[in-house]
Design a protein with these regions (language model features):
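Cyclophilin-like peptidyl-prolyl cis-trans isomerases
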Residues: 15-274
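Sec-dependent N-terminal signal peptides
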Residues: 3-13
Length: 274
């Protein structure tokens, strides 16, 4: 009978754990941020949880801060710990997750020394980014400019060069003028000036903002779900050489177990079916 009760208790505990997930809290002098970690990136998720449980992130700093781009931290090796973290994590790219504002992603070494785009074992960044117009997200402006330069050579567009010269010091006006000739460039030279982008990305980058050029280059493994304004505050601090804040911005990271349906209901993350 005792064995049966023991087995039932283990089963109940196991079921309860399966119905729960971690909710991350990142404490900073500017306020707290809460984050969720995606199950679709299991290697990065496990690594982040393990380091958090070990207290590795505590007393680390945001060592690289770039306004309208991202805030980077988590380099536990800067603490001078003799047990340096020098391993990498295989990339876990997923089209569902992209670099909209608040995305939690893994930093990494550049392609020339890291062609597989493997992630740092500890460093991460949180996207600040900027809001883009729909034209910026759906039109290859460089391809369009190349097409316009071809038009300069056409007799019927001989006055076009002068029009561009008049607005050359105004980036927005230059772009606006070029857009008027998009259809002509497409048809006349067969240049593809349109870019494909899924509706979810288009809506996110044109409303909340982000850093779309990072998509497919770095693994996004989580998202800030509370304290988005803290990203702006940290991104706005004064920085010195190497984009390092003049005054340290330390952090401590902790986790708590909450029900998965709480995360889905409050933060909109839908867990994958197993």
């Amino acid at each position: 009978m005792k064995n049966l009760i023991f087995i039932l208790l283990i089963t109940i505990t196991s079921c309860n754990m399966e119905n729960k997930d971690v909710l991350i809290t990142i404490k900073t002098p500017y306020g707290d941020m809460k984050a969720i970690l995606f199950e679709e990136t299991p290697l990065h998720k496990k690594n982040f949880i393990d380091l958090t449980k070990q207290g590795q992130f505590n007393s680390t700093i945001f060592h690289r801060v770039m306004k309208d781009f991202m805030i980077q931290g988590g380099d536990v090796n800067l603490k001078g710990d003799p047990n340096a973290i020098d391993y990498t994590i295989p990339s876990e790219f997923n089209d569902k997750f992209f670099h909209s504002k608040g995305a939690l992603a893994a930093a990494r070494q550049p392609d020339n020394v890291n062609p597989k785009k493997e992630s740092s074992g500890c460093q991460f960044y949180i996207v600040d980014g900027q809001v883009f117009s729909r034209d910026e997200l759906t039109i290859d402006i460089q391809a369009l400019y190349q097409g316009v330069q071809l038009l300069f050579q056409e007799e019927e567009y001989k006055d076009l060069r002068n029009e561009f010269i008049q607005v050359q010091n105004n980036r927005d006006e230059t772009k606006k003028l070029a857009l008027q000739y998009k259809d002509i460039v497409d048809e006349k030279y067969g240049i593809k000036t349109s870019m494909d982008i899924v509706p979810e990305k288009l809506d996110a980058y044109s409303n909340v903002g982000g850093s779309p050029h990072l998509d497919g280059e770095y693994t996004v493994f989580g998202r800030i779900v509370e304290g988005i304004d803290i990203i702006d505050k940290i991104a706005a601090v004064k920085t010195g050489q190497g984009n390092k804040p003049i005054e340290d911005v330390p952090m401590t990271i902790s986790l708590e177990m909450v029900k998965k349906n709480f995360i889905s209901k409050n933060y909109g993350y839908q867990y994958p079916n197993k």
